[in-house]
């Protein structure tokens, strides 16, 4: 039962997918940016038996919001409960649960939110945002769980680490994506807007949030346009989420992490198996798609880093 001043909304969806598979997908919070459309980035802060604490950045009503949550995971009852520890206005408190109720006809997924608002006038907007994001999350979860292939074949992560003359200079090169059309031969045009995060934990308060639209030239001479949200922490990291992934993917996110003289480029992708043959040709498999993505995305990151290293000049 909700406490005084607290409100409850419940979203449900039935699926033929097994309950345990659905539970395990929700439990893997690191994969959320590649699976759930609203989620931009997740940083795990603590993890212990049956509990974890993480910071999340997500798009809510077209803006990027951040909060810190603690979760309890029960693999026996297939239940995940959560509670926000650090909220942002207009939310005063937020918690809830994921439940997966299997029966002979499939599984009912139940996503519950209990929340209170700083100002009651904000309630309609909060309900609208919860309805929109919860609907997207349930649809994406069920779509992935109902695939014939195991989720671990479709969602995977890979990374490359390269040495550079200066990690700080490499950060400056990659952060200034508005100059890429002058610096990278495959980039035709970049449109960039940015704003300071301004809120959240002290260690990320100097973060900037970038909205980047980029037009690139493909190997066959055509053009391809992508749009990404990027979270930039000076000299440390740039994480990103593609809002409209390429045709082969249902989700794509990644990160650039900078050391003193190294940069690591990481990609997490979710393959759309229904598009594999359309993109790669008749008879192509998910395994072929994994190889293709590893080669193409990895090559793009390495090429960007080589240009960044060249711009920085030789190591002193």
Swiss-Prot record:
Stored SUPFAM superfamilies: Bet v1-like
Gene3D superfamilies the record matches: 3.30.530.20
Pfam families found in the cross-reference section: Polyketide_cyc
InterPro entries linked to this entry: COQ10_START, START-like_dom_sf
Transmembrane intervals: none
GO biological process: antibiotic biosynthetic process
Domain of life the protein comes from: Bacteria
Matching CDD domains: OtcD1_ARO-CYC_like
Keyword set, alphabetical order: Antibiotic biosynthesis
Pathway: Antibiotic biosynthesis; actinorhodin biosynthesis
Cystine residue pairs: none
Function comment: Is needed for correct cyclization of the oligoketide leading to isochromanequinone formation.
Record protein name field: Actinorhodin polyketide synthase bifunctional cyclase/dehydratase
Organism name: Streptomyces coelicolor (strain ATCC BAA-471 / A3(2) / M145)
């Amino acid at each position: 039962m909700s406490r005084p001043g607290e409100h409850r909304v419940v979203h449900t969806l039935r699926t033929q997918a097994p309950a345990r598979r659905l539970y395990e997908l929700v439990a893997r919070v690191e994969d959320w940016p590649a699976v759930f459309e609203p989620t931009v980035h997740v940083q795990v802060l603590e993890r212990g038996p049956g509990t974890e604490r993480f910071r999340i950045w997500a798009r809510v009503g077209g803006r990027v919001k951040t909060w810190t949550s603690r979760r309890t995971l029960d693999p026996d009852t297939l239940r995940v409960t959560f509670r926000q520890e650090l909220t942002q206005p207009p939310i005063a408190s937020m918690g809830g649960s994921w439940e997966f109720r299997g029966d002979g006809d499939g599984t009912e997924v139940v996503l519950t939110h209990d929340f209170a608002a700083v100002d009651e006038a904000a309630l309609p907007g909060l309900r609208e945002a919860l309805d929109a994001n919860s609907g997207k999350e349930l649809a994406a979860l069920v779509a992935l769980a109902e695939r014939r292939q195991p989720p671990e074949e479709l969602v995977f992560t890979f990374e490359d680490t390269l040495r550079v003359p200066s990690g700080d200079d490499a950060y400056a090169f990659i952060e200034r994506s508005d100059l890429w059309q002058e610096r990278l031969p495959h980039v035709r045009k970049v449109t960039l807007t940015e704003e300071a995060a301004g809120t959240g934990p002290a260690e990320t308060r100097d973060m900037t949030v970038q909205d980047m639209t980029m037009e690139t030239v493909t190997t066959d001479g055509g053009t391809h346009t992508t749009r990404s949200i990027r979270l930039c922490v000076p000299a440390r990291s740039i994480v990103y989420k593609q809002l409209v992934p390429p045709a082969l993917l249902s989700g794509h996110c990644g990160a650039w992490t900078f050391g003193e003289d190294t940069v690591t480029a990481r990609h997490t992708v979710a393959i759309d198996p229904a598009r594999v043959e359309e993109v790669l040709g008749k008879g192509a498999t998910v395994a072929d798609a994994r190889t293709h993505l590893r080669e193409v995305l990895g090559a793009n990151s390495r090429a960007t880093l080589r240009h960044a290293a060249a711009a920085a000049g030789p190591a002193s």
